[in-house]
A protein has these predicted regions:
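Extended alpha-helical targeting/anchoring segments
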Residues: 1-478
Length: 478
């Protein structure tokens, strides 16, 4: 692992901390190229030019990292003591050692979201005691350079943290500025399924779990519980090839691909968790879903049905109130506002109902305080959060692992953005895991909730299984 360089002795100009690269509207080629390096991370807007999907962030070769897989912890730096119970403090220790406070006079590229810093993901936690959580699946790394692709301004930038060694800066500038055509040389490796996806929860078990949640709600124990189920398939080949295949059919503004060597996360998430810009906080929970229609008329009818649904509005408002409460722990009193309620956002296979809540971070708090205060996101737990999480642990047969956690960046300039890892797969030991779920409330219908799980995951599963069928047909022709 590279050693920490000395702090900068003079103010860095923008020209020293970033350089221009040739713009390509499709970041797939950059992903392929950087995938040859260690532990690549791609935060992928899928070329969505909306305010929430303008930038792609790509990096690799972290100077230090932490990973946990099913509770097994590995830290690249033995001097950093960390546990799953105190994981956020471990991230803080990593940040303090490898990302010391920069010179306040540094001229950052203020428009670019990431200036070097922390990139990674946190899986859905388990409960530890009455009020604490334990992170059992995660990967976070310290990345001192990144490629930022701005699809709105059609520009690409190679950015560096002030601690990035000069030799590494020169190497990356030369390598990424080369004019060679890498498209043919870096064609992705093949990916194929070796078995169809199978659900790990029988219909009878789902019905029983639904019934128990309904009883908890009727007794006043909780108002909403997010019930999920796991799907699994055997596979072979490159997880990046699978991700690139999926992103062609499932465009989502908070997509991500992370590979930590013996595992990879493939996320096609449409949902923002938390964003911090300066002291401005934004969270945008999704609650309420309808499938896309087979015709324009059917699609418009389903979208209108979602917008008019009192049930979906009530569920959405429950989560808005939960997030207002979470933000209240770290934001200035009186600053928290619901700036938009029940907006319609449409994606390739579903319509979603989305709300927006904003606040101003308190003077004595930072991005890690914000993340730890609100994690996991209320849209994937239920309300009240701790009681819903207790019920989830009691009823769900399989751990959620990467699902319902967050992929995030924490930039050296203090800014942060993150997703909720829905529509997300975990690749490990030639197996693919994915999950789907929904919020159960007092008037939920068991059949409808069960079907909604499949609406949410159907596009992902069908794309990968169709790829397998096409490969089999090609082999038969040969």
């Amino acid at each position: 692992m590279s050693s920490k360089s000395n702090p900068p002795s003079a103010v860095h100009a923008k020209s020293q901390l970033s350089s221009r690269l040739r713009y390509n509207p499709d970041s797939a080629q950059l992903m392929l190229r950087l995938s040859t390096l260690e532990m690549p991370v791609f935060l992928d807007s899928s070329h969505d030019q909306s305010n929430c999907g303008r930038f792609d962030i790509l990096s690799a070769n972290p100077i230090a990292h932490i990973k946990i897989e099913s509770g097994r912890l590995r830290v690249s730096d033995p001097e950093i003591e960390i546990s799953g119970i105190d994981f956020f403090n471990g991230i803080r220790l990593l940040k303090q050692k490898y990302l010391p406070e920069p010179d306040p006079q540094i001229e950052w590229e203020t428009e670019l979201p990431f200036q070097g810093g922390i990139l990674g993901y946190l899986g859905y936690p388990s409960l530890h005691g009455k009020n604490a959580i334990e992170i059992r699946d995660a990967f976070v790394g310290v990345y001192l350079w990144a490629v930022i692709v701005d699809h709105l301004k059609q520009s690409s930038h190679l950015v560096f943290h002030p601690q990035c060694p000069t030799a590494e800066k020169t190497r990356m500038q030369n390598w990424l500025s080369a004019d060679e055509d890498f498209q043919a040389a870096l064609a992705p490796a093949n990916f194929s399924l070796r078995s169809p996806f199978t659900k790990e929860l029988s219909r009878a078990d789902y019905n029983q779990a639904f019934k128990q949640i309904a009883e908890f709600i009727a007794a006043g124990d909780c108002y909403q519980v997010n019930l999920t189920q796991q799907f699994r398939a055997d596979c072979s080949g490159s997880p990046l090839a699978a991700y690139l295949l999926l992103r062609e059919s499932t465009r989502a503004p908070f997509s991500a691909y992370i590979n930590w060597g013996n595992g990879a996360l493939l996320s096609l998430s449409p949902e923002r968790f938390l964003k911090l810009t300066g002291t401005a906080v934004l969270t945008q929970p999704i609650k309420g879903t309808r499938p896309r229609g087979d015709s324009i008329e059917a699609d418009e009818r389903l979208a209108a049905e979602l917008c008019a649904s009192e049930k979906d509005r009530a569920e959405n408002l429950m989560i808005v109130d939960l997030l207002r409460n979470d933000l209240g722990r770290v934001c200035k009193t009186g600053s928290i506002k619901a700036t938009a309620l029940f907006d319609l956002q449409s994606f390739s296979n579903v319509h979603h109902m989305v709300s927006s809540v904003s606040g101003e971070l308190a003077d004595d708090r930072d991005a890690l305080d914000l993340l730890s205060s609100c994690f996991p996101g209320g849209s994937v737990t239920g309300a009240p959060k701790l009681r819903a999480m207790t019920i989830i642990e009691q009823l769900e047969a399989k751990a959620r692992r990467a699902y319902c956690g967050t992929v995030f960046y924490l930039s050296a300039n203090g800014n942060m953005d993150s997703n909720i890892t829905i529509r997300t797969l975990l690749w490990q030991q030639d197996q693919l895991f994915c999950w789907a779920g929904g919020g159960i409330v007092s008037d939920s219908d068991c059949d409808a909730e069960y079907e909604e799980c499949f609406h949410k995951i159907s596009n992902i599963i069908s794309v990968l299984q169709e790829q397998e069928r096409e490969q089999e047909q090609e082999q038969e022709k040969e």
